[in-house]
């Protein structure tokens, strides 16, 4: 499903409104942390798991140590006071005449206001939308994002996508790992560009 620009703009506008409305967080929620810990470190410690990923840019295999070091600052970099969804993607958004509605919040946490935008953009690129870097920095919510913090968070979530793509599919979600692999490919390309 390629993104139509008007639909994408509706979601991007909604993400801006969401950040405004949910800062500070209106509920007590846990601080954002990387689900499952440090994924590049896991892949670094078990390099065979990366070698099996024929879809993965070879740059990753040559830079696992750098990627693991980059994700180490995730918790500090992701800190903030905004209630964030952490799983914005096309199937968690309803487009209405009054704007985007974000559904399915089981992983809500408190973090930086720009987290949802960053997490969302690899799936947009995967589904025929624009490349993420320009879209991220053109969005108003990115004005409060420090580039080093953004890079640490991008490294962390990219490691999550890539590592999860190597795992068996959970019951009832047979396409999840393929989706995460697609997110991972586009996130790796974004990360590689920023780490060049």
What is the meaning of each model-derived region?
Residues 1-61, 79-81, 109:
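A cross-family kinase active-site recognition segment
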């Amino acid at each position: 499903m390629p993104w139509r620009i008007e639909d994408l703009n509706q979601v991007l506008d909604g993400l801006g409104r969401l950040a405004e409305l949910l800062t500070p967080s209106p509920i007590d929620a846990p601080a954002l942390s990387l689900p499952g810990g440090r994924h590049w470190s896991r892949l670094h410690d078990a390099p065979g798991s990366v070698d099996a990923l024929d879809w993965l840019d070879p740059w990753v295999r040559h830079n696992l140590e750098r990627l693991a070091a980059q994700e180490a600052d995730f918790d500090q970099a992701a800190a903030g006071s905004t209630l964030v969804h952490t799983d914005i993607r096309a199937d968690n958004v309803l487009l209405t005449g009054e704007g985007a509605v974000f559904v399915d919040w089981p992983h809500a946490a408190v973090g930086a206001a720009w987290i949802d935008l960053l997490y969302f953009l690899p799936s947009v690129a995967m589904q025929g939308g624009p490349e993420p870097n320009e879209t991220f920095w053109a969005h108003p919510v990115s004005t409060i994002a420090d580039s080093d913090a953004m890079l640490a968070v991008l490294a962390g979530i990219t490691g999550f996508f890539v590592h999860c793509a190597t795992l068996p599919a959970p019951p009832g979600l047979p396409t999840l790992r393929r989706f995460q692999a697609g997110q991972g490919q586009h996130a790796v390309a974004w990360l590689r560009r920023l780490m060049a």
